[in-house]
Amino acid sequence: MKVAVCLHGLARGSSVQADGAFLENYSTLLKKIRGADIFIHSWDEDIKERLIQIFSPISNIFEPQRKFSKEISFFRGVQFDGDTGINQGDLFKTLSFLYSRKESVRLKKEYEKKNNFKYDVVLVSRFDVGHHNNGLNKTSHLNFDPALDMSKIYQAYWNQTNAGASDHWFYSSSQNIDYLTLLYDKLPEHLNKHSDYTKLCKKGWPLSNAEDEFSGELFKEEKSKNLCQYVSGDNVLINNHSLYKFHLMEGNLWEDDQSIFLNKNLWHD
């Protein structure tokens, strides 16, 4: 079985405390991915040599944090007001996160093409597994089992599936993970007032419940018809969780038998 791990982003965390992973030399993550081929895209140039020494990646890109000025200018005129039904995100942060994830997976794809094979299992993940918000973020705890059926896509369970996917990590077949990272390229299509994504945000978000945001409509037989409305007027929602949900729905990967949510037990206390 051939397993790839695509790591991306800021290796020491960002605005949320997550440097415990760095301080422990990523031992929590390394225990989970022992024997896998590793690919890295990171903005942390200053610790490049240390990360290469720790992970021994097949391929890597370390570059200065991009400003995404050109990409942001494309959205000039789009209304991203804070008056939304769930948290309004930040365009720069979304571009940075999704680009880095896409680049780490691109390295994997190039290696597959060069060597004429496909990985059986691909995990795409942030670096701070088990340490996000000092470990209090349950979705950061990685439950990685390469023996599972990779026609499905695996992600961390959380109590906000009505809104979208917990996007800390995913694993599946190589093909499914390739599709997952296409979200970056689809942002101009989704983040405009006329898009199908925005229409759903405005008219009624699928598998949501306006009376109970934590109801887990995806897992219910009888689903609420009282859907959440996240935006109004010309406003457009930037929310990674909702964008991933919409993207997976478009790829027929959000159904209850296709998206498998792990670590539900962490939410029972």
Show which residues each predicted segment covers.
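GT-A fold catalytic core of metal-dependent nucleotide-sugar glycosyltransferases
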Residues: 101-154
